[in-house]
UniProtKB/Swiss-Prot annotation:
<dbReference type="Pfam" id="PF03764">
    <property type="entry name" value="EFG_IV"/>
</dbReference>
<dbReference type="GO" id="GO:0005525">
    <property type="term" value="F:GTP binding"/>
</dbReference>
<dbReference type="InterPro" id="IPR027417">
    <property type="entry name" value="P-loop_NTPase"/>
</dbReference>
<dbReference type="InterPro" id="IPR041095">
    <property type="entry name" value="EFG_II"/>
</dbReference>
<feature type="binding site">
    <location>
        <begin position="86"/>
        <end position="90"/>
    </location>
    <ligand>
        <name>GTP</name>
    </ligand>
</feature>
<comment type="function">
    <text>Catalyzes the GTP-dependent ribosomal translocation step during translation elongation. During this step, the ribosome changes from the pre-translocational (PRE) to the post-translocational (POST) state as the newly formed A-site-bound peptidyl-tRNA and P-site-bound deacylated tRNA move to the P and E sites, respectively. Catalyzes the coordinated movement of the two tRNA molecules, the mRNA and conformational changes in the ribosome.</text>
</comment>
<dbReference type="InterPro" id="IPR000640">
    <property type="entry name" value="EFG_V-like"/>
</dbReference>
<keyword id="KW-0342">GTP-binding</keyword>
<dbReference type="GO" id="GO:0003746">
    <property type="term" value="F:translation elongation factor activity"/>
</dbReference>
<dbReference type="InterPro" id="IPR009000">
    <property type="entry name" value="Transl_B-barrel_sf"/>
</dbReference>
<dbReference type="InterPro" id="IPR004161">
    <property type="entry name" value="EFTu-like_2"/>
</dbReference>
<keyword id="KW-0547">Nucleotide-binding</keyword>
<dbReference type="InterPro" id="IPR005517">
    <property type="entry name" value="Transl_elong_EFG/EF2_IV"/>
</dbReference>
<keyword id="KW-0251">Elongation factor</keyword>
<feature type="domain" description="tr-type G">
    <location>
        <begin position="9"/>
        <end position="289"/>
    </location>
</feature>
<keyword id="KW-0648">Protein biosynthesis</keyword>
<dbReference type="Pfam" id="PF00679">
    <property type="entry name" value="EFG_C"/>
</dbReference>
Length: 708
């Protein structure tokens, strides 16, 4: 076997994904400790975790950016290279999770043994389904009071619709948790506290656990029989003839096909269970060789599909999945190489910009420290320096064999705040700092209000913007004043309107002329984009070359609705007919006619204001539930359901307009004496009632007269 192929076979690109407090970063830290990359274990609760490298992360104890780390692990005599991506679990940062999942081959879904499947676990699980990422489950915090491995396994099945397949069961729970039973080898593993869990012993299963272990082994074999014919045959004839090797092959096969999720458990904080988790990563998660060939399109012919296999001899194909600013080396671009390889000092083609870029240096990252590399090969994750123009989602490839990979889609920001520098000298620094941060984060936008000159920054939630302001202060030394949060409203129309628009201009010499008849109406329910444009012009009444200009005019005009200049969403425009002048008509005339048609038709089409609605989940003690629901009702919330958690707390699910959620965390703390927690994420846009629309439009001096 060629050395390169061997290298691919022993590479794992994995992410650790979970709810905010399930212990992702702690687990990552233990992996770095046991694989020999760190000599002191970092703890998230004392702010020394290696993976949480931004100052705000260390203060807040949560992970914001996905730090990518390369480490090694010896398993069955082979040295495995593990590229580990630590992903955030807070809903304001789901975009970071999406980015990571796009470039991973497999994932470790971490669950808290006490909290089980929490709201964010569901979100992340759905994201991993979307990208077809095989996963193994790790039930962490087995040492905590209320830990229940079997209940978490049940929740995976019932809440997530997963097919959990325990390959370990715990020995003890809460303070008596001391090891696991390996159901494949039918042995007990005990970790030694005196070596901080670095050493463990493999022993016979304690007699009092033997029957339970056999029962769970049988359940494991039954799950494997469903996805492997060879096991099924032996399982029904004589299960005792199934060999350890056959079980390992079947688990790997079922995991890669996403038919099962092998389940392991441990307590990362107490240094138990991490080595067996690493073994499971090497044994069951895919190598780049196990992933299908990546598909892209030909930049010169977007209908032509190109595939690239994960081979070193294929032309270079890589995806930029994150841009970060490093204080020492400048702009760092993280990328995943799907085919071929990148050499330091070489040129690559960016198919979005159409430009060749020279990569001056290459690194592999250990959290935020760089290890210089000469080459980053197929199936690997690395970072490069030297890019002049690079964005998240760009394809980097060989200029002689261009390819464009599917770009990444990011949600639109839903909340904005106005910012201004405290002093005049901060003015330039503010602009530069915001531009750099917007480059790093595709869900963060910066706009300048042309009328007021105000700078408005927008993001995915209050925490997201807090952290941006914090980074401006720390990294760019800019102090700024901030306004109160503003909601990013949208506009929509409710009725169809048909209209003829003629644009004519005569000023001596060649004039301007365009004549269009359009029907404007709300887009079809199933339509995903912003503008659904249909051309029904017959007989060349409008020449083909002018039709894209009509579409372009509507696209431009939709950015500013007639009520208050908010963008329009989901519009259907049908170009029915029109006429042109052989001398005076040009592309610009048709574009202007479309812009005017939009403005005139919108005012007659029942324009309405749309507001972002958030999906909220509040976990509260029973005795505070009445107050919590009363408060949500006051905030125009719609309670959709209530559940009881394992610990007896009540879980309230509601849809609440974003405009009513500002300061909610503080209010919730007050009404429940700090005993409730909440999480929310964007759900959809919905029409605002006329009384509230008038209030909003009065604030922004919009067209209140158009609201019925």
């Amino acid at each position: 076997m060629a050395n390169n192929d061997k290298q691919l076979m022993f590479t794992r690109n994995i992410g650790i994904m979970a709810h905010i407090d399930a212990g992702k970063t702690t687990t990552s830290e233990r992996i770095l400790f046991y694989t020999g990359l760190t000599h002191k274990i970092g703890e998230t609760h004392d702010g020394t975790a290696t993976m949480d490298w931004m100052a705000q992360e260390q203060e807040r104890g949560i992970t914001i950016t996905s730090a990518a780390t390369t480490t090694f692990w010896n398993y069955l005599g082979n040295r495995y290279k593990i590229n580990l991506i630590d992903t955030p679990g807070h809903v304001d940062f789901t975009v970071e999770v999406e980015r990571s999942l796009r470039v991973l081959d497999g994932a470790v879904a971490t669950f808290c043994a006490v909290g089980g499947v929490e709201p964010q676990s569901e979100t992340v699980w759905r994201q991993a389904d979307k990208y077809n990422v095989p996963r193994i489950g790790y039930v962490n915090k087995m040492d905590r009071s209320g830990a229940n491995y079997y209940e978490v396994v049940r929740q995976l099945k019932d809440v997530l619709g997963a097919n959990p397949c325990p390959i370990q069961i715990p020995i003890g729970a809460e303070e008596t948790f001391k090891g696991v039973v390996d159901l494949i080898k039918m042995k007990a593993i005990f970790w030694h506290d005196e070596t901080m869990g670095a050493e463990y012993s493999v022993e016979e299963i304690p007699a009092d656990l033997q029957a339970e272990a056999e029962e769970w082994r049988d359940k494991m074999l039954e799950a494997l029989a469903e996805c492997d014919d060879a096991i099924m045959e032996k399982y029904f004839d004589d299960p005792s003839t199934i060999t350890e090797e056959e079980i390992m092959v079947a688990i790997r096969k079922g995991t890669l096909a996403m038919q099962i999720n092998p389940m392991t458990c441990g307590s990362s904080f107490k240094n138990k269970g991490v080595q067996t988790l690493l073994d499971a990563v090497c044994a069951f998660l895919p190598s780049p060789e196990d992933t299908p060939a990546i598909e892209g399109t030909d930049p010169s012919d977007p209908d032509k599909i190109i595939t690239r296999k994960p081979l070193f001899e294929e032309p270079l194909t890589a995806l930029a999945f994150k841009i970060a600013t490093d204080p020492y080396v400048g702009r760092l671009c993280f990328f995943r190489v799907y085919a071929g390889s990148i050499n330091a000092g070489s040129y690559v083609l960016n198919t979005r910009s159409g430009k060749k870029e020279r990569i001056s240096r290459l690194f592999q990252m250990h959290s935020n420290k760089q290890n210089p590399m000469e080459v980053i090969g197929c199936g690997d994750i690395g970072a490069g320096v030297g890019f002049k123009d690079i964005r998240t989602g760009d394809t980097l490839c060989d200029e002689n064999h261009p390819i464009t990979l599917e770009s990444m889609e990011f949600p639109e920001p839903v909340i904005g705040i106005a910012v201004e520098p405290k002093t005049q000298k901060d003015m330039d620094k503010l602009g530069m700092g915001l531009a750099k941060l917007a480059e790093e984060d595709p869900t963060f936008r910066v706009q300048t209000n042309e009328e007021t000159g105000q700078t408005v920054i927008s993001g995915m939630g209050e925490l997201h913007l807090d952290i941006i302001i914090d980074r401006l202060r720390r990294e760019f030394k800019v102090e700024c004043n901030q306004g109160r949060p503003q909601v990013t409203y949208k506009e929509a129309i409710t009725q169809p309107v048909e209209l003829r628009e003629v644009y004519k201009k005569q000023s001596g010499g060649r004039g301007k002329f365009a004549d269009i008849i359009v029907r404007m109406e709300p887009a079809d329910e199933s339509f995903e984009g912003t503008l659904q444009f249909i051309d029904e012009v017959k007989g060349g009444n409008i020449p083909k070359e002018f039709i894209p200009s009509v579409q372009k005019g509507f696209e431009k005009a939709m950015k500013n609705g007639v009520l208050a200049g908010y963008p329009l969403d989901k519009l259907k425009v049908t170009l029915i007919d029109g006429s042109f002048h052989p001398v005076d008509s040009d592309q610009l005339s048709f574009e202007i006619a479309a812009i005017q048609a939009f403005k005139n038709a919108s005012a007659k089409a029942g324009p309405v204001l749309m507001e972002p609605i958030m999906q909220m989940e509040v976990v509260t003690p029973e005795e505070s539930m009445g107050d919590v629901i009363g408060d949500l009702n006051k905030r125009r919330g719609q309670v959709e359901g209530m559940e009881t958690s394992r610990t007896g707390a009540r879980i309230v699910k509601a849809k609440v307009p974003l405009a009513e959620t500002f300061g909610y965390v503080t209010a919730l703390r007050t009404i429940t004496s700090g005993r409730a927690t909440s999480s929310m994420q964007f759900s959809h846009y919905a029409q605002v009632s006329s009384s509230i629309a008038k209030q909003v439009l009065t604030e922004v001096q919009g067209r209140v007269d158009l609201i019925k």
